[in-house]
Amino acid sequence: MADIVILGRGQDFSLLTADDSPAEMGPYLSAGPIHKAARYQLYALLLGCFSEEAEAFEYLHHQLDTDGPYILLIDRLITNKLATFEESEVEQITEHWLACSPMEALDVEADQVLSFVFELVHLCKLRAQTEQLDLFVYHEG
């Protein structure tokens, strides 16, 4: 299963079990073929850091079983930054992101990635409106 980005409350995800559907936890977005290394590259572009440093901005919130799946929390530094983006900025960051090696290696159309980033920004804008919400990634490992 592809990773899923989900908007929700941390305490709700702490109760999630391996038998539960993560899509029922709140508004969500499938990452499709966009894996962790590619997301780290996006975070690096947003923050002006190395992708190795960007790994620190997505961390374990809850482990559903010994070998996963995992609920990862996306740091608010990332979500707050994305929440401020206007349409032209979304297009610009997507263009730069597509030129990075983890994204070049994926079999994904530029329009699909642009749509993903627009939807991600929308979730981040919703998150910014409600202090109790955060953005999580459901990752099977």
Predicted segments with their positions:
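Acidic (Asp/Glu-rich) sequence patches and key acidic residues
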Residues: 1-130, 138-141
